[in-house]
Curated annotation (Swiss-Prot):
Species of origin: Rattus norvegicus (Rat)
Coiled-coil ranges (or none): none
Keyword presence, Magnesium: no
Keywords: Calcium, Cell membrane, Cytoplasmic vesicle, Disulfide bond, Endosome, Fatty acid metabolism, Golgi apparatus, Hydrolase, Lipid degradation, Lipid metabolism, Membrane, Metal-binding, Phagocytosis, Phospholipid degradation, Phospholipid metabolism, Secreted, Signal
Name used for this protein in its record: Phospholipase A2 group V
UniProt modification remark: This enzyme lacks one of the seven disulfide bonds found in similar PA2 proteins.
Length: 137
């Protein structure tokens, strides 16, 4: 997940319009948690950002581990998790996925589970893990 958010940040800053779910994920994180997705979660712990290994550092990192596994299941179903875009609405604090085809709706569901988990675990967020080095995982 570390690389995923890093790539989202890069794409968001350098390309005006980008296909794929990375920008949707970034937007969803920011709407639900109120935190900057890249700065706060792009390099957090052992699992937030691209890839991940080791033991999650706290509740926030466990959310990212769960998200990595959700994406892994979608990859097994041949979903293009890095390029597949999807539509969602954010209404009254709820994320509503708006797709009827298999991969987009499931990708959105993975991201929705992540952001709800991150919101539930805002209390566990520890700045010591914000830019945690991978070699310590």
């Amino acid at each position: 997940m570390k690389r995923l958010l890093t790539l989202a940040w890069f794409l968001a800053c350098s390309v005006p319009a980008v296909p794929g779910g990375l920008l949707e994920l970034k937007s969803m994180i920011e709407k639900v948690t109120g935190k900057n997705a890249v700065k706060n979660y792009g390099f957090y712990g052992c699992y937030c950002g691209w890839g991940g290994h080791g033991t999650p550092k706290d509740g926030t990192d466990w959310c990212c581990r769960m998200h990595d596994r959700c994406y892994g299941l979608l990859e097994e179903k041949h979903c293009a998790i890095r390029t597949q875009s999807y539509d969602y609405r954010f209404t009254q604090d709820l994320v509503i996925c708006e797709h009827d085809s298999f991969c987009p709706v499931r990708l959105c569901a993975c991201d929705r589970k992540l952001v709800y988990c991150l919101r539930r675990n805002l209390w566990s967020y520890n700045r010591l893990y914000q830019y945690y080095p991978n070699f310590l995982c």
